Structures are given as structure tokens and as C-alpha cells.
């Protein structure tokens, strides 16, 4: 449908910089996710693309055509909001048909298209109902149907599943992915939910404080975060971070955090010390395992801790451990025997899947 390019886009509200010199390229037919915490500027980006907000500086292009001064109605985009924004006095059929009605589309064609879209979204049986008679999931589908029936060039979706219950949200995610693949419409989806982003997007842009920190496919971002913010934001539970220092023992060099020692390359250590960088070690909860303190075989890549909280999730257990007044998280198999108050030995499974960051800048170093 359309390739969308944002070039050095900035948006200010008074002295507040909501979007700060942001550049993005969204490919034709791509399902692109803007992911970040509340207030990071992702909804403002969506509004700028739609033309609902004016640029402070920069340019926006649709298929190479600058659309900075193009009014919203001329951009041929369809938006779905968190609140769904259905007309309360109209039933579902009338809400879906409304965009065609204002275009003066023939009644017979409107009827045909509404029935087609309703069938696609499995809402044919609720077309006679008013919004107050519909569940959150049904209202979400009606809002989507109203966007689809316009046959826009671009879909802009602003947290459309946030008001849907957890069970239905899982189903709705799958339906949205399938629908986007079928319609082949460039889709830009805003969310603060990293699970939505990881499961739905072809690519993800991580945003914070009006800037993009990293753009890539879900696996790339999970496995190769560029900084501590991305590493801590993407992944559930989030990455564990350990503060420490470099130590030398005979011919060996280690990163040491309390009783945890992780071997590092001498060249890496020398570079860090030369630049006077304070190191942070990052380890994902899935890369840790636990055992009895009595099973300690080596002083390398393990440490002792106390079990603080045990969350049994059915297929696995999330353990919160306490170490030196810090809380860290570990994912272990459901059959693991563990109780609150246990003293345990925590081991790093795979040292090649650990990360080092600059404490001051947050930048990933290795």
C-alpha cells in the first residue's frame, strides 16, 4: 500500500519536546510497532502521521510524497483508538457504514461491504446492537470494521486492545495479525505492552522521551539490545542488572559483584579501565538456574541468595530472590522445589548470553 518515512520529526507543546528529531522508515505492507512507556511520544507520532497534529519541524512522506501540509481527510489513513470512539446512538451496522454513508456510497454497496467486513471479523450476529450492549472485544471489532471498510492506505492503531480482557486479548492479537496479512495494508501499531509488540510486529521501534532507541525485528531486539533501557523494557520478566567491578586473580580477569564472579577478556577489561567506565552486568531471568548451596562446585558464575517471593505460573515458576538488598528474578521449571526463605545457589547457564553495559550512559559494551 504505502511506505511511510519520518525524517527528523520534532513536535513541541510549548517548552515540552514530545517527539525529538525522530527518523523512521515503515515499509509497504509492514506491521510496524511503536513500543514504549506512557508519555514517551508514541501516540504523538501516530497523530503526526494522521495529520491530527502539526509538525514543529521535519518531514513526513507517503510513498515519497511530502504530506506535511496535507489535511487528515486527504491522507487516506484510518485510526482505531483505545476508546474505540463509536457513535452511541448508532447500532454496530450504522457505525461501520458511516464512513461510506458520508461519501454518498450507494446503499446497496454499503450493505454488501458491511456484510463482508462483518463476516471477516465474525460480528455479523451483533450488527443490530448499540455500543452499550456490546462487550469490550465486540466494540473493538466494530471499530476495526469501521476502519477497514474505508479501504485506507494506512492503518494507525493506538493501543486498541488495552480495554479488552486478558483472554480475549490473546485471541484478538492473533486475529489482528491474520487480518493485516490478508488486507496487506501498512499498519502502525502503538503499545506499551512488550508482549503485544514481540508477538505482532514485523519490526519494532523502542521509544523513550521522544526518541527511538532501537529499531529491529523482535528477536534481534530481544537478543541484541543496544542499551540498558531496551534490555530492561523488552523481555518478561525484565533483565537483571548487577553492579560490580573488574578484578584480577593471577592470569584471570573477572567482573565481580558481591560473591558473583564472571570471567571477561583481558583486552575488554583494559579498555574499560582505560575509559574509566563503571560496568553493569545484564542477565535474563531465563539464563539463571538454582540449586542447593551444598552443590557448589566452582566459584565462577554463581552466587548465593535468599528466596523472597515464589510465583507459580503453572508451566513455570517465577522466583524473586534477594541479594544485597536487591531483588532479581529467575524463571525455573514448574516442578522445581523451592520455598520462600530458602537459601539457594544461583548459576548463570550460558555466559555467552550475558551483557555488559556502561552504567553512566546505559550503552551496551558487549
Label the model's feature ranges.
Residues 50:
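Helix-to-loop junction immediately C-terminal to a conserved catalytic motif
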Residues 252-308, 336-366:
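Glycine/charge-rich catalytic "coupling/switch" loops of P-loop NTPases
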Residues 58-66:
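Conserved ABC transporter NBD signature motif
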Residues 35-37:
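The feature captures the beta-strand-to-loop junction immediately N-terminal to the Walker
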Residues 56-59, 109, 209, 243:
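Conserved coupling/switch loops of ABC nucleotide-binding domains, chiefly the family-specific signature
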Residues 72-229, 233:
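ABC ATPase nucleotide-binding domains
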Residues 24-26:
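Conserved hydrophobic segment flanking the Walker A/P-loop of ABC-type ATPase nucleotide-binding domains
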